[in-house]
Amino acid sequence: MLKRRRVAVLSPVAWRTPPRQYGAWETVASNVAEGLTARGWDVTLFATGDSVTRATLHAVVPRGYEEDRSVDPKVAEYLHISEAFEHAAEFDLIHSHYDFMALTYSRLVRTPVLTTIHGFSSPQIMPVYEKYRDGYFVSISDSDRAPGLRYMGTVYNGIDLSLYPLRAHGGGALVFLGRIHPDKGTHLAIAVAQQSGRPLLIAGIIQDSEYFREQVEPHLNAQIRYVGPVDVAGKNALFAEALALLHLNTIPERFGLVLVEANAAGVPVIAMDLGSCREVIADGETGFLVRDVADAVEAVARVGEIVDRVCRERVERLFSVETMVAGYERAYQAVFDAEDLR
């Protein structure tokens, strides 16, 4: 039986944990900390000072640098990460959700570090992973793995299902929910809406202003609307109006938390068949996997085949906080076992 021990959960400091609106990594770190705490672990969450948690909160950065532009990102990150590692001896495990930066501290402490890789943001960061390839890693999908790293398993991201209730009924609008960026294919969602004759609601932060001005804003009208960033309540309001969620990435998806959130509410997802989408969406059951805009337009005509309850039941089975935390407990045990053999 796994012994509950002392765990430090290291969350990013771009946004509050959990985030008010955007912030997938912070969302997952929060769900891990809350889920572990509920299962009896002694958890300390390293996050911004305005974060909300039932675990012990340890903070040296008052607010996220994306929310308070007076906070210098590099200064905040180095103070935050170094603070966690200076307290490493107080924990049996550090669970990092911090990409490659925290890895550079991992050999300076005796406490084992497990890193959840939320995505390889660019080829330029790979030398860090290559140097620390003998560390402990978890992937968030089988598709998003790098060769040569020591993986303790794949643990799918889990959501708090109470935040995304099954909707009473759907609407007739297509919904895009994510960063306004070429990688997320906002322009493709617009094309699908135009060709299918359906209204489109676009929600999310504008991460690429030039892209928004050139490929999104000129198409905004009564049919295609940009509603800005949304919080959980805003997402649920969109899901209530949704015929389907369009997730037409132009690059391989690492996981796609919004796919799970939409399915939890009973919303079918039309997703580009790239990266993890095949793991998250059951083609023909919880949505449709497509190759291009033409495929997506055909899928819009078929969304009536998808049953809301089936979508939610799959999320309950595979993508709940409880399922995720159980997966991390197995990964923690694998780390502890490996450490015992050293």
Place the predicted regions along the sequence by residue:
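Catalytic cores of nucleotide-sugar-dependent glycosyltransferases that transfer UDP/GDP/TDP-activated
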Residues: M1-R342
